[in-house]
């Protein structure tokens, strides 16, 4: 009996509500990434409670973020918003002296029409500290889009690339080559290697990653003779990369479509549409795409990928043949599904709150090719999924694992479906060759837990009524 496998991806769109964290949660990782910044969230008590509980850091501990709490006087326009924000920002400058203050707008600032963009330039002149305004409110599709909003706002603050300066650098490099006789042999080799790496247009990568992961990706590109000119965001606001005509940019996360649009339209950069460096297959495709744009032939990438797959053998034996269902939460679903299919899993459905098909075109193409290579059915992709309909489909399909938001995890577990919180993939280190193990560690944890319970014989839930004797 022959099984016919669909050759194309199926896209559907339902009319469900968005079930996700508030995008102001981006403060959790961005304030740690941009070390000389201060985030001021302008919202209500609800926003403060969310930040305090979700981030696990007490506001009273004075981290590098704070709440500007709106009161009844602000909402009824009895107070002067500008004067109140001015007082707070001067206090922040006195206490913390940041290089940049980032205002995070919320739902309330949208509803009462606070003109944050109008107030920021005026206050910036008085304060002497740059103020970046980002509207990371709950009107977005997914909580990860908070980072997208902040990076899009910061892209406007990146310095303009000066072609004259770049030409002067070339002249200086040529002068250095002319006086090589003054250098040692080791110094000559280092300088030649540097000049060789710079023999391509500037490359800026955008997306917030831990410093160790960003260094790993930069090193992987350096092995292919590609030098990364800068990252957006940087660890220090004062080190933002230069942008402009002739600068190539490439994203590392699938939820940064707004930033990509800003870089293309406003800063005139050239976007490299590549799959995202999640999993060994995605990382290899990401490097190959960047190399092909610069006309550089890759070397040793296939062997590097095979080494990683070899090191994951124990995990692959556990997940091979298992099925997974993505309910949709953080916009990482397409990349994770592609990687898990490559690991031998069957993906029934990819629920995703929203997808920019232009920005994720390369990722979708790689997903399609991976399904053909692994001879597995093409998963259905459902935008804005309705959770009620999803539950009905899961009852029929009975997947081995459901990757879902925190709100649905316990109800699904009670119905006998293994779950994994999708938010964990957001905070885990999942990019690059070396972090593929962490992805599979998260995916296999529920499966390994169940295997351990079966070994103990704990397979049935037994309810026993104890009769209490009254003496």
From Swiss-Prot:
Q: How is the cofactor bound?
A: Binds 1 [4Fe-4S] cluster per heterodimer. The cluster is bound at the heterodimer interface by residues from both subunits.
Record's superkingdom?
Answer: Eukaryota
Q: Which residues bind [4Fe-4S] cluster?
A: 22, 47, 107
Q: Which coarse location class describes where this protein primarily resides?
A: plastid
User: Where is this chain's protein located in or outside the cell?
Assistant: Plastid, Chloroplast
The keyword Iron appears for this protein = yes
- Kindly list the biological process annotations in GO that this record carries: light-independent chlorophyll biosynthetic process; photosynthesis, dark reaction
CDD domains this protein is in? Pchlide_reductase_N
Q: In which pathway does it act?
A: Porphyrin-containing compound metabolism; chlorophyll biosynthesis (light-independent)
Catalyzed reactions per annotation: chlorophyllide a + oxidized 2[4Fe-4S]-[ferredoxin] + 2 ADP + 2 phosphate = protochlorophyllide a + reduced 2[4Fe-4S]-[ferredoxin] + 2 ATP + 2 H2O
GO molecular-function terms, A-Z: 4 iron, 4 sulfur cluster binding; ATP binding; metal ion binding; oxidoreductase activity, acting on iron-sulfur proteins as donors; oxidoreductase activity, acting on the CH-CH group of donors, iron-sulfur protein as acceptor
- Required cofactor(s): [4Fe-4S] cluster
Give its E.C. classification number.
Answer: 1.3.7.7
The residues the entry assigns to the signal sequence are none
Q: Which Pfam families match?
A: Oxidored_nitro
* Record carries keyword Cell membrane: no
Q: Name one GO cellular component term.
A: chloroplast
Cite the entry's keywords alphabetically. 4Fe-4S, ATP-binding, Chlorophyll biosynthesis, Chloroplast, Iron, Iron-sulfur, Metal-binding, Nucleotide-binding, Oxidoreductase, Photosynthesis, Plastid
Q: What does this protein do?
A: Component of the dark-operative protochlorophyllide reductase (DPOR) that uses Mg-ATP and reduced ferredoxin to reduce ring D of protochlorophyllide (Pchlide) to form chlorophyllide a (Chlide). This reaction is light-independent. The NB-protein (ChlN-ChlB) is the catalytic component of the complex.
Subunit structure, briefly? Protochlorophyllide reductase is composed of three subunits; ChlL, ChlN and ChlB. Forms a heterotetramer of two ChlB and two ChlN subunits.
Q: Which family does it belong to?
A: Belongs to the BchN/ChlN family.
Q: What is this protein called?
A: Light-independent protochlorophyllide reductase subunit N
Q: Which organism is it from?
A: Anthoceros angustus (Hornwort)
